[in-house]
Amino acid sequence: MARKPSKTRPSKAKSGPALTHIGATGEARMVDVSDKPATERLAVAEGRVLMTRATLDLIVSGNAKKGDVLGTARIAGIMAAKRTSELIPLCHPLALSKVTVDIEPDAKLPGCLVRASVKVTGPTGVEMEALTAVSVACLTIYDMIKAVERGVRIEGIHLVEKLGGKSGHYRA
């Protein structure tokens, strides 16, 4: 049975910063950025894919059945950054200036450290694009090795750094 949407309105108490994607009556909305200046913005995100040492060795040696795991994941992450507005409903479509996805095998984890950097000159930031790039790159690694190891874990996806815009510099 389908649930009826709640008619409860959000509290009007000013206890902290307002959510920019929520309208006065609680509806989701896309933020109007038309009056914001175009400035250079950068976001960096990272995450980890944890696996056994044997699976990591298979990836590093290039002997995975599905092919070049790291190269495929890198391209998937770049593609995902460019399509973020199609995946996350209230994100603005952006003409990204640069997307890099770096994947470092790490025997100490064991696993792979995935890091994405996204740059734009525009009226809104690229945090979601960086996080989406990392998420999809990690998921691609998982997809390409799941037949070898079912216990693979994706962990720690987070924003590492953000530069530009009204809120300035952030570093985790």
UniProtKB/Swiss-Prot annotation:
Catalytic activity: (8S)-3',8-cyclo-7,8-dihydroguanosine 5'-triphosphate = cyclic pyranopterin phosphate + diphosphate
Gene that produces this protein: moaC
MF annotations from Gene Ontology: cyclic pyranopterin monophosphate synthase activity
Record keywords: Lyase, Molybdenum cofactor biosynthesis
Composition-biased stretches (Basic residues): 1-12
Name by which UniProt lists this protein: Cyclic pyranopterin monophosphate synthase
Organism: Bradyrhizobium diazoefficiens (strain JCM 10833 / BCRC 13528 / IAM 13628 / NBRC 14792 / USDA 110)
Pathway(s) this gene product operates in, as recorded in its UniProt entry: Cofactor biosynthesis; molybdopterin biosynthesis
Annotated binding of substrate, by residue: 90-92, 128-129
HAMAP family (alphabetical): MoaC_B (MF_01224_B)
Biological role: Catalyzes the conversion of (8S)-3',8-cyclo-7,8-dihydroguanosine 5'-triphosphate to cyclic pyranopterin monophosphate (cPMP).
Positions annotated as active site in the UniProt record: 143
